[in-house]
């Protein structure tokens, strides 16, 4: 418990209360609801049915590894015997471990006791926000993805502060779990691998950077290959949705794809702004066969070329829709639909951990970034730690853009990991700013965090 806030007994009590709240919510969602003793308020939608059906297949089969989603959640479902109550309890327990690990790691890299408390409590309150907690009661990939994200960030911070084989091994293992939980996660891992290779030019970082870069690239390539091996490929319907909802709703984009072979006719004119995956004639009807052929043969290539040749559109459109990044309140709709939205104390605590106002979150981002950059420039924050926090925030933005461009359907849900990652970065940055102010101007030796000085 080195580096925990003092008094340590109080910190342990906070962690205990957090665990009770998370697991208590899981038990309630899994065992009570709708007026019956056994009537689970578990989020179970079309994706859930596909995941549980694929989880029946043998682990090494193509149907399992290249199924309807990345196989990480399918493996969890199989280990839980595809029992929805067991899945809720297990992924909630994993969430407790992951969030506590991240919160205590953040506390351990602070020097002042005040900053340790702010970092730890802020992270735990974020985990209790209704828009985050509700996913523990859903039969989807979000909860496991967030737990993997917490593990990646915690091991990453530990690796930056005190490089060691154990931290490196933990970081690589967490990257694997993260990459094989959601397809957009694999893209983020691939980007991280490229940065790791760039860091390998520094002699002191060469070995860990090469290990992270090689492993991350292998995970990203493997996850992408499995996604492409699915039938249809997992990019197929997202590209179709994006074409119908976004590209055909924009005159300029429509002209571009028509010039690149899109079968524009009277039937295609009915597609703009429609969620075509839910429209049976588009999925199977003969009148839309040309559209399905175009998506499979040319769709992904043409869409990618459009983004590359129209960077203004590619950057501006997600920015205009940035509420999906800065607003964690809208996503609570899923909890209301399945009647399992955490209320009461969770709403109060969540308002602190993840403020509901997008405007407030944007202002918090700007103020924290300016203060953090200034103190890092004055070397009041350890350079390696400052770089790590900047990467966390930067990859949150990249993750949001990848989610927005990756699928036009359920953007708030697909951008959840990026939105949570942004708030984690904000809490770490805020704690580090307070830490630097509380400590005041110091010598180089005091830049070592508590977890290192205690050794």
Give, region by region, the residue ranges found by the protein language model.
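Membrane-interface anchor segments at the N-terminal boundary of transmembrane helices
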Residues: 9-11, 85-94, 314-392
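Transmembrane-helix motifs of polytopic, lipid-linked glycan transferases
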Residues: 89-113, 151
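Membrane-interface alpha helices of multi-pass inner-membrane proteins
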Residues: 168-182, 213-220
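Loop-to-helix entry region of an early transmembrane alpha helix in multi-pass inner-membrane enzymes
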Residues: 67-75, 82-100, 120, 135
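Membrane-proximal stem/loop segments at transmembrane-domain junctions that anchor or position
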Residues: 229-337
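Membrane-interface transmembrane helices that cradle and orient dolichyl/undecaprenyl
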Residues: 152-168, 200
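Extracytoplasmic catalytic/substrate-binding loops of multi-pass membrane glycan-assembly enzymes
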Residues: 30-52, 63-76, 82-85, 295-296
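Start-transfer (signal-anchor) and selected internal transmembrane alpha helices
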Residues: 1-31, 211, 440-441, 448-455
């Amino acid at each position: 418990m080195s580096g925990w806030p003092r008094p340590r007994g109080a910190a342990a009590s906070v962690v205990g209360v957090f665990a009770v709240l998370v697991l208590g919510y899981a038990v309630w969602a899994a065992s009570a609801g709708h007026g019956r003793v056994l009537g689970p308020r578990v989020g179970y939608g079309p994706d859930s049915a596909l995941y549980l059906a694929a989880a029946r297949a043998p682990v090494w089969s193509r149907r399992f590894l290249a199924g309807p989603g990345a196989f990480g959640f399918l493996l969890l479902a199989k280990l839980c015997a595809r029992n929805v109550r067991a899945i809720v309890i297990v992924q909630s327990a994993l969430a407790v471990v992951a969030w506590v690990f991240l919160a205590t790691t953040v506390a351990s890299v602070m020097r002042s006791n005040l900053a340790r408390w702010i970092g730890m409590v802020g992270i735990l309150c974020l985990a209790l926000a209704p828009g985050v907690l509700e996913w523990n009661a859903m039969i989807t990939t979000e909860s496991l993805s967030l737990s993997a994200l917490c593990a990646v960030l915690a091991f990453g911070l530990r690796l930056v502060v005190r490089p060691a084989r154990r931290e490196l091994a933990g970081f690589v293992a967490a990257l694997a779990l993260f990459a094989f939980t959601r397809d957009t996660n694999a893209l983020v891992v691939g980007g991280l691998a490229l940065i790791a290779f760039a860091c390998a030019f520094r002699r002191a970082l060469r070995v860990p950077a090469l290990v992270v870069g090689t492993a991350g690239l292998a995970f990203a390539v493997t996850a992408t290959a499995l996604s492409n091996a699915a039938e249809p490929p997992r990019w197929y319907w997202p590209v179709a949705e994006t074409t119908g909802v976004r590209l055909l709703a924009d005159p300029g984009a429509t002209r571009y794809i028509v010039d690149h072979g899109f079968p524009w006719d009277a039937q295609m004119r009915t597609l703009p702004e429609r969620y075509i995956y839910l429209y049976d004639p588009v999925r199977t009807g003969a009148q839309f066969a040309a559209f399905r052929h175009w998506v499979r043969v040319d769709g992904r290539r043409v869409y990618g070329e459009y983004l590359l040749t129209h960077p203004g559109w590619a950057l501006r459109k997600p920015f205009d829709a940035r509420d999906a990044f800065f607003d964690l309140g809208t996503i609570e709709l899923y909890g209301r639909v399945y009647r399992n939205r955490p209320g009461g104390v969770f709403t109060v605590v969540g308002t602190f951990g993840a403020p509901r106002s997008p405007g407030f979150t944007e202002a918090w981002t700007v103020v924290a970034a300016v203060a953090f950059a200034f103190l890092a420039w004055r070397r009041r924050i350890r350079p390696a730690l400052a770089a790590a926090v900047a990467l966390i925030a930067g990859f949150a933005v990249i993750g949001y853009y990848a989610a927005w461009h990756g699928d036009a359907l359920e953007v708030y849900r697909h951008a959840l990991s990026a939105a949570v990652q942004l708030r984690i970065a904000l809490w770490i940055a805020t704690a580090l700013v307070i830490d630097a102010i509380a400590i005041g101007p110091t010598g180089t030796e005091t830049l070592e965090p508590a977890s290192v000085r205690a050794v």
